């Protein structure tokens, strides 16, 4: 019986290649734990919170940043968080980037760019690490935490601090301490 359990455990382990990697101490931050690797650190840049409409989410396992941020959220806020507008926004998330479009902008393009963003989500604790993966397109969530900078060996990953920037480096690197569902919508 003992050998059978060991064999089952061994087979389960062999079939979990990437899952095993994500449980190593290198992935502590992505699992909501404190960094223990000697070159890893998180620095708070400023507190951040708000209501955000989820336009999409993408889970990452294999990129360098997955050690810290296991999921990205495509979000809107303000006027663009209203369901009648948000349902018309289509998103494509890839390689930690976000492309979005809407057939008819209800505001000037410059203003619209300030109401949609890609957020790299870092869980502040193991409970949040589970909750952040439960969002669905259309959910309005209240997120509270900090915009941060991550350092790891040769990597410096720093959050944007302004909603007016676009392009590379314009995303929020958001360490989430709490998440509350304000409403669930199907958009």
Where are these regions (language model features)?
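Sequence termini and other peripheral, non-core segments
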Residues: 3, 15-22
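Bacterial N-terminal signal peptides
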Residues: 9-15
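Bacterial N-terminal signal peptides that target proteins for export
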Residues: 1-7
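OB-fold and OB-like single-stranded nucleic-acid-recognition modules
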Residues: 19-187
């Amino acid at each position: 019986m003992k050998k059978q359990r060991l064999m089952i455990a061994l087979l389960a382990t062999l079939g979990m290649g990437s899952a095993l990697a994500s449980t190593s101490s290198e992935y502590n931050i992505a699992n909501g734990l404190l960094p223990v690797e000697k070159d890893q650190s998180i620095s708070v840049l400023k507190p951040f919170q708000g209501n955000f409409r989820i336009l999409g989410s993408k889970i990452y396992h294999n990129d360098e940043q997955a050690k810290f941020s296991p999921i990205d959220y495509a979000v809107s806020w303000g006027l663009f968080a209203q369901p009648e507008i948000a349902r018309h926004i289509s998103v494509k998330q890839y390689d930690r980037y976000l492309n979005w479009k809407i057939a008819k902008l209800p505001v000037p393009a410059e203003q619209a760019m300030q109401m949609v963003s890609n957020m790299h989500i870092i869980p502040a604790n193991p409970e949040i690490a589970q909750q952040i993966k439960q969002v669905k397109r259309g959910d309005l969530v209240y997120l509270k935490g900090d915009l941060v900078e991550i350092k790891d060996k040769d990597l410096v990953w720093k959050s944007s601090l302004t909603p007016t920037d676009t392009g590379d480096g314009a995303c929020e690197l958001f360490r989430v301490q709490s998440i509350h569902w304000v409403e669930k919508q199907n958009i």
